[in-house]
Amino acid sequence: VAQEKVVSNTPAETQVINFTGPMDLTVELKSSDNFETAEMTDNSGKIYHLKRAISGSGMRLANDDGVSIHFKAGEGIVEFMKDKPISITEYKNKIIVAG
């Protein structure tokens, strides 16, 4: 008996994670394939294309130009140049309901 593989044509949900860092740095990480690949945008509007990389713990994405982001439990490191780490923190929007 052959089993049919069900293929879904619905696009994957886009996931977005925002980070903040020193000197008003903001970083947006966006992926539609569960962070196998991602687009990282900094607050100057520059876009970096990253792919999943090996990490001991947490999630790490990098490209061949030395750009990387590595994060776990809301804390992380971003490198726009190899060996120049910048500490970042995940920024979650707080919804305030006026009463």
Say what each PLM segment does.
Residues 2-99:
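Cysteine-centric segments in proteins
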